[in-house]
């Protein structure tokens, strides 16, 4: 019996090491040449909870690598995904025409963004392969120069890449802008052994892919991804150029999610994928931008957003919290405070911190290790409950460690794919909250109903007023 129990326990431990309660369907590395269609495609990849963007490489094409890097980094920064690695392919000799629409259309704040210290794409890709063991889709939104470079220089690439998805704007495999950027790489890639899925652009037949109705619907979605694409259509240079309304490289994002909406013809290791369902594809854009590509919850389908569902004192703030901070923070906040059994400010801070960390890396739940320095003594330790719910990093999953240092701190470290950041509540915010709680405790005492009523009232106010992008210091540890 003892031997059986020992084997059983070892089996459980091993299962814990290798199991995962939920994983996205697609792990991707994206290569881009900086086109505005690439911006729409990348935004869609980032918006989908069923896709994990592990890294982005930039190569010459529509823009030079340096300018493409600036566009990509400014886009990621504007979406608060600063932790996604971006590398540069400087090997390709193609001289970019620097198309004005792509060059002049902003993706985010470019001030302070420079390609000077950007990592080499091969080094970056190699580091991704060393940490992520799930097979990857390598997506080429421009040329296949970077893909070919990786194939030549990373010996075990075939063990890590299950397919290449390449956007082709030509009528065949051997023509079009993306093919001609690096003809040698294109020709060699089409002859190698790993599957290549060649995704065609949507052929308009006198119909714009992004018609007025689709653009209108995108503008009503009210999240940071839809707002970024709406800003493109609102910009003077893009909205007055017909290319903005075509469905080109963003077909890669749609194909990854909805391959049945394409006519797929396979010959050898090459599959030609042609968009075929216009209505379905337009609806697919909306679904992706809304994040409706996978169920986010385990038991309930969705939490109501109707204020009347909630307690009377929080009803006036429901819509504002969701509009300002998104449905993820709202849902995590509701669940964390139900778990916590009272509405507390440090539980709310923990939720905001966890969502901010997930944003930084663009991860889902259960995907990184967290170490909390909030200790085990309330009220600061209440932050741990918010962290657990918002990140899925729980003690039961072995993903949350609580440090009991002599002096606790409203901070936590998050480690994902050999990268670590530390988030700390800004001192002035921490002092304001702590002083307020101490004063309420001094006046009313912890056993007073008035104390807990005022804590609840203040917690709702902090939930509504504290922006997670403004209240934390974010430090890169490594």
Write out the residue ranges for each language-model feature:
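Short, N-terminal intrinsically disordered low-complexity segments that are rich in Pro/Gly
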Residues: 58-65, 243, 322, 339-347
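C-terminal segment of classical bacterial N-terminal signal peptides
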Residues: 14-18
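Sec-dependent N-terminal signal peptides
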Residues: 4-13
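N-terminal acidic, glycine/proline-rich low-complexity segments
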Residues: 20-306, 394-395, 477
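Non-transmembrane, aqueous-exposed alpha-helical and coiled segments at domain scale
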Residues: 260, 293-343, 349-478
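Active-site nucleophilic cysteine motif
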Residues: 245-254, 342-352
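Hydrophobic alpha-helical scaffolding
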Residues: 175, 179, 243, 343-344, ...
């Amino acid at each position: 019996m003892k031997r059986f129990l020992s084997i059983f326990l070892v089996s459980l431990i091993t299962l814990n090491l290798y199991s995962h309660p939920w994983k996205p369907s697609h792990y991707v590395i994206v290569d881009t040449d900086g086109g505005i269609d690439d911006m729409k495609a990348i935004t869609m990849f980032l918006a989908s909870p069923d896709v994990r963007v592990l890294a982005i490489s930039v190569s010459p094409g529509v823009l030079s690598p340096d300018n493409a890097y600036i566009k990509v980094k400014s886009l990621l920064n504007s979406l608060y995904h600063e932790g996604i690695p971006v590398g540069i392919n400087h090997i390709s000799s193609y001289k970019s025409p620097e198309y004005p629409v792509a060059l002049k259309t902003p993706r985010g704040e470019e001030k302070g963004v420079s390609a000077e210290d950007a990592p080499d794409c091969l080094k970056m890709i190699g580091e991704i392969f060393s940490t992520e063991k799930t097979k990857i889709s390598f997506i080429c939104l421009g040329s296949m120069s970077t893909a070919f470079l990786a194939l030549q220089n990373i010996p075990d690439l075939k063990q890590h890449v299950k397919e290449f998805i390449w956007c082709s704007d030509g009528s065949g495999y051997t023509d079009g802008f993306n093919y001609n950027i690096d003809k040698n790489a294109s020709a060699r890639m089409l002859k190698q052994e790993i599957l290549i899925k060649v995704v065609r652009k949507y052929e308009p037949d006198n119909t714009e892919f992004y018609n007025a109705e689709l653009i209108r619907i995108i503008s009503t979605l009210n999240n940071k991804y839809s707002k970024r694409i709406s800003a493109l259509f609102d910009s003077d240079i893009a909205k007055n150029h017909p290319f903005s309304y075509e469905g080109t490289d963003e077909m890669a994002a749609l194909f990854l999610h909805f391959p049945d909406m394409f006519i797929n013809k396979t010959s050898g290791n090459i599959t030609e994928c042609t968009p075929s369902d216009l209505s379905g594809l337009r609806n697919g854009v909306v679904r992706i931008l809304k994040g409706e590509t996978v169920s986010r919850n385990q038991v309930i389908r969705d939490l109501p957003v109707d204020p009347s569902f909630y307690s009377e004192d929080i009803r006036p703030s429901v819509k504002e919290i969701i509009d300002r901070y998104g449905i993820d923070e709202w849902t995590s906040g509701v669940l964390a405070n139900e778990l916590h059994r009272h509405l507390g400010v440090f539980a709310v801070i923990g939720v905001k911190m966890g969502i901010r960390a997930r944003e930084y890396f663009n991860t889902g739940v259960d995907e990184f290790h967290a170490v909390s320095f909030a200790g085990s003594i309330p009220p600061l330790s209440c932050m741990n409950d918010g962290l657990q719910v918002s990140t899925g990093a729980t003690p039961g999953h072995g993903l949350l460690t609580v440090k009991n240092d002599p002096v606790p701190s409203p901070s936590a470290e998050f480690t994902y794919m050999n990268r670590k950041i530390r988030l700390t509540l800004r001192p002035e915010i921490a002092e304001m909250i702590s002083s307020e709680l101490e004063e309420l405790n001094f006046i009313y005492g912890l056993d007073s109903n008035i104390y807990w009523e005022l804590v609840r009232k203040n917690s709702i106010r902090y939930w509504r007023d504290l922006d997670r992008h403004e209240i934390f210091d974010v430090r890169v540890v490594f």
